[in-house]
Design a protein with these regions (language model features):
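Sec-dependent N-terminal signal peptides of Gram-negative exported proteins
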Residues: 1-20
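Poly-acidic low-complexity segments
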Residues: 3, 66, 144-145
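Acidic, serine/threonine-rich low-complexity disordered tracts
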Residues: 20-113, 157-274
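A charged, solvent-exposed segment within the mature domains of Sec-exported extracytoplasmic proteins
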Residues: 116-179
Length: 274
């Protein structure tokens, strides 16, 4: 049985390349997101993704503050690696660390053959006896939040293909084990910006949050997220790929409406790996 600490955080390019001289090449994507709680800006997140053949490496750096850090200042780093296959992502590692307000922590996970094989959380915390335990069987086929966000949605149709919303994603973030059941909601046109390489249309998916284990039944966020029908993710195509990645996320929480919106996306062409 795997015990965890519910750290919260809350891209699928399959065509790697080989240069003519057989040197492996790499594609790099940089996506920036603005994070808000209701109408208040909390900070930003930057995800840098490197892809070579079927391998991926992702690093996310976040900075969140209130009043320029006078009341609150938090920095987070998350990372993931693995492979993208025709059946979906196969993560090998995932990590999340944070530091702020005199507090810090780190979570690390390893995967093998489609299941979690190791979990480390520092500092360790005493498990609440009310917590629903995570079983090893529940971890088979589960993926980490990075793989879930960037490597599950794929389509050759770049114009807001609503078929990318027809899926259920099994997620384990080191604390909670849950399913995200996506379903088509609508297609919307986006305003084109010079700073973004996203396509013109977004597929808007309704998301049903289905908690399975690793949580306390009276957790207020669990209650809000599992009973709302307002969770949305807007998925957009990255030109030149079959990737659909998040452009906009809406997540009701016990503290208010949390949202993340992409402000820019940069795609850099193939280049030799360092």
């Amino acid at each position: 049985m795997v015990q965890g600490n519910p750290y919260r955080e809350s891209p699928c390019l399959l065509c790697g390349a080989l240069a003519e001289d057989s040197i492996a090449t790499e594609t790099r994507l940089v996506a920036n997101y603005r994070v808000d709680l209701d109408n208040f800006n909390l900070g930003s997140f930057r995800f840098t993704t490197r892809l070579s053949a079927s391998d991926y490496r992702v690093r996310g750096d976040g900075h969140f503050s209130i009043l320029g850090g006078l009341l609150y200042d938090l920095r987070t780093t998350t990372a993931g690696s693995g492979k993208v296959t025709s059946a979906g992502p196969e993560p090998t590692t995932y990590s999340l660390s944070y530091a702020g307000g005199g507090d810090s922590g780190q979570l690390r996970m390893s995967f093998d053959a489609g299941t979690v094989t190791a979990l480390s959380i520092v500092p360790q915390q005493t498990r609440d006896p009310r917590e629903i335990p995570v079983t090893q069987a529940q971890l088979v086929g589960a993926i980490d939040p990075i793989a879930a966000a960037f490597f599950r949605a794929r389509s050759d149709d770049p114009n807001g293909d609503l078929k990318v919303c027809d899926q259920t994603v099994p997620v384990f973030d080191g604390g909670w084990r849950y399913d995200l059941a996506l379903s088509p909601k609508r297609k919307v046109a986006l305003q084109r910006k010079a700073s973004t390489a996203y396509s013109r249309y977004a597929a808007v998916c309704r998301v049903e949050f289905k908690p399975i284990s690793g949580y306390e039944p009276d957790d207020p966020n669990i209650k809000v997220m599992s009973h709302t029908d307002a969770i949305e993710v807007w998925l957009v195509s990255v030109p030149g790929t079959d990737m659909y990645v998040p452009y906009h996320i809406l997540l009701p929480t016990d503290s208010g409406l949390l949202s993340a919106t992409s402000t820019s996306l940069r795609v850099e062409g193939n280049r030799p790996q360092p």
